């Protein structure tokens, strides 16, 4: 993915504002009125936000609450801002649990993290992040890093910027014909071009996303953990009729292989589908390519469609693991059915000699005469 493509498109984000260094929610306290106690309002408790729109063409911009509400800092206190995106890897709004390091659900004052369970299908982009001030912003706060984020920091022009990191491994796919016959050449022959009808990768699908935590900063690989067995995730594509980049992906349309340069040794490279986002951390991923090819099975009949399948393994060196937040381009060389053409070559008879049988002699002992050697043609000087 190019930097130009790495822009927001109005995705749904979820945001927490927590008391600094803890899992406790931040509350805004309204002033007391006479004998009426001050009311407490949660500021951002798993609040739904919208990222900047695609029209903004930006990778960093102001996110807005989905319901249009405006929030304000409490008069005192410092706070942490956390954000995450689960796409549709959860049914409905995400349910976040407070847990300790052992994974047991506990009260907020005993919790060390907030987590949400997800299930991926290969199309979701799971992201998470925490706001952290830049060096320049810390300088604006008098080099007191603990003064963020707060009403004081806001007065100094320092507001939370949550950096969202991609937590899955991304595969994009290209295909090419490995032979001219695979691309349906020569035209009018007994086999048409192979079509790629599906691509799938085996990956774990059930995981737990850590959306906020206490303690030292965690690596991206530690924020999303997967359990259970792997299953096939199927490559999909964007709906060409829809301009909304957030619209659900649709089933892959068949892609015919081509070969335009007759002098080339390999077919044209063709992009297939959108991308597959899989659980990171594996050294290899089983890959299955579903194919079809129209072939003539009998002279005088019409061609029939033959389903084919090609299996492979996506790996670098078998030792290095695929990392979260990285996109890898996978180029697949495809081979279709090759017509069997049997050539018959007739070997001439070789003179084996003659056998003379005479009853006046012993009829059981014929006389064998070696064949006359063939005189080789003279070689002209």
Regions from the PLM with identified roles:
Residues 186-205, 338-356:
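Short linear, low-complexity motifs centered on an aromatic residue
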Residues 93-96, 300-302, 312-314:
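Edge beta-strands of extracellular beta-sandwich domains
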Residues 199-250, 254-255:
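Contiguous ligand/interfacial binding patches
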Residues 1, 322, 326-381:
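Intrinsically disordered, low-complexity repeat and linker tracts
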Residues 1-200, 236-242, 248-260, 265, ...:
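Short, low-hydrophobicity acidic/polar segments
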């Amino acid at each position: 993915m190019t930097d130009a493509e790495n822009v927001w498109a109005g995705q749904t984000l979820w945001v927490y504002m927590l008391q600094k260094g803890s899992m406790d929610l931040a509350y805004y306290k309204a002033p007391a009125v006479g004998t009426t106690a001050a009311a407490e309002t949660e500021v951002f408790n798993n609040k739904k936000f919208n990222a900047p729109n695609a029209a903004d063409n930006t990778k960093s911009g102001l996110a807005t609450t989905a319901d249009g509400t405006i929030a304000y800092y409490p008069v005192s206190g410092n706070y942490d801002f956390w954000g995450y995106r689960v796409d549709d890897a959860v049914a409905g709004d995400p349910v976040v649990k407070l847990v300790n390091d052992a994974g047991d659900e506990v009260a907020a004052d005993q919790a060390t993290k907030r987590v949400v369970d997800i299930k991926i299908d290969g199309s979701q982009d799971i992201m998470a992040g925490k706001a952290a001030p830049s060096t320049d912003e810390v300088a604006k706060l008098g080099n007191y890093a603990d003064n963020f984020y707060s009403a004081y920091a806001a007065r100094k022009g320092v507001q939370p910027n949550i950096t969202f990191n991609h937590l899955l491994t991304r595969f994009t796919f290209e295909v090419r014909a490995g032979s001219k016959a695979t691309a349906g050449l020569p035209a009018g022959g007994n086999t048409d071009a192979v079509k790629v009808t599906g691509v799938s990768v085996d990956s774990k699908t059930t995981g737990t996303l850590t959306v906020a935590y206490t303690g030292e900063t965690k690596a991206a690989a530690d924020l999303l953990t997967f359990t259970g067995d792997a299953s096939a995730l199927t490559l999909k594509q964007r709906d060409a009729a829809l301009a909304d980049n957030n619209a659900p992906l649709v089933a892959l349309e068949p892609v015919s292989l081509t070969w335009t340069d007759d002098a080339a040794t390999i077919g044209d490279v063709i992009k297939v589908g959108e991308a597959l986002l899989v659980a990171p951390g594996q050294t290899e991923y089983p890959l299955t390519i579903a194919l079809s090819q129209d072939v003539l099975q009998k002279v005088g009949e019409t061609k029939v469609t033959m389903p084919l399948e090609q299996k492979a393994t996506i790996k670098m060196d078998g030792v290095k693991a695929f990392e979260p937040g990285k996109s890898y381009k996978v180029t697949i060389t495809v081979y279709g059915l090759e017509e069997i053409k049997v050539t018959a070559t007739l070997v001439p008879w070789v003179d084996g000699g003659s056998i003379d049988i005479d009853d006046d002699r012993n009829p059981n002992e014929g006389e064998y005469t070696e064949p006359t050697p063939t005189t080789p043609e003279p070689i002209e000087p």
